[in-house]
Amino acid sequence: MIKVTLTNEILRYITEIEQNRYKVSSVKLSKTVMNKLRKNSKKKSSYASNKIEGNPLSEKQVDEVIESDGRKHYLKPEQEVRNYFLALNYLEEKVSKKEKLSMKLILDVQKLVEKGASKEKIGLRGPMPPGVLFAVYDSKTGNPDYIPPEYCDIPGLLNELVEYVNTTDDHPLIVAAVVHYQLVTIHPFEDGNGRTARLLSGYIMDLNGYGFNG
């Protein structure tokens, strides 16, 4: 069972965010301007989220790749940013339908993030070969930084997260933070955990009126 304890500092930050949210939501923009700003925001998110994972493309290159719809083949770094942008569009549609978080939605988002990857990287991770440890390794030392839960515990942990999100009375910003933390902690996939966590954390915010114009 997921429980959250709020400190005075966290409550102070939430109050500050709410005040800024009110200021932003009161700004009136035309639909054309709004759509342009929204698209630019999604491009910047696609750049930043993949940059965290080591994607070498510059912000300008990301913009060009997203706009280049005519090509048939993309290099891996290009495919990654296109996948992220498509996942943002997908979740935007889900927000319009007020779709709640579900196991299916989590899996669908990771599948979009890993589009073009080998089938082993798509979906929940399975058992490792004998003697092989599944862990998050330090990129410099090669030592394990974090050992996530066993693969057999993943479905139960994800279902617990889904139930929490859909039944809790916690503030939406707290729920979004919990979604991000739990997904990177559970580490349910072989690859794409961080990007999926950031996408779904943002989705929870969008769903509760903390999106681009909220």
Regions found by a protein language model. Give the residues of each.
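FIC/Doc superfamily catalytic core
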Residues: M1-G214
